[in-house]
Amino acid sequence: MAGGPRRGGRRRKKVCYFTANGITHIDYKDTELLKRFISERGKILPRRVTGTSAKYQRMLTLAIKRSRHMALLPYVKEEQ
């Protein structure tokens, strides 16, 4: 049963964080918000993991890339 919910467990429907909180603009300078959508290795998390809608995922990706370019966020995290 690869890919299915675990024995009797029901998956919770993911809700878009931005829609639920009424956020209409994602600012590239708000690094604390952007860090919520980046993996521990520094990669942008996909929609299927975060539950973000397509519209806000595009805005989020653009904001993260701008933030990286301005050196507010790292491109990759260092190994320890």
Swiss-Prot record:
What are the protein's UniProt keywords? Ribonucleoprotein, Ribosomal protein, RNA-binding, rRNA-binding
One GO-annotated biological process of the protein = translation
In terms of InterPro entries, this protein maps to: Ribosomal_bS18 (IPR001648), Ribosomal_bS18_CS (IPR018275), Ribosomal_bS18_sf (IPR036870)
One GO MF term attached to the UniProt entry: structural constituent of ribosome
GO CC terms on record? cytosolic small ribosomal subunit
Task: Determine if Endoplasmic reticulum is one of this entry's keywords.
Answer: no
Keyword rRNA-binding in annotation: yes
Oligomeric state and interaction partners are given as: Part of the 30S ribosomal subunit. Forms a tight heterodimer with protein bS6.
What's this protein's family per the entry?
Belongs to the bacterial ribosomal protein bS18 family.
* NCBIfam families documented for this protein: S18 (TIGR00165)
Tell me, what does this protein do in biology? Binds as a heterodimer with protein bS6 to the central domain of the 16S rRNA, where it helps stabilize the platform of the 30S subunit.
Its recorded name reads: Small ribosomal subunit protein bS18
Q: Which organism is it from?
A: Staphylococcus saprophyticus subsp. saprophyticus (strain ATCC 15305 / DSM 20229 / NCIMB 8711 / NCTC 7292 / S-41)
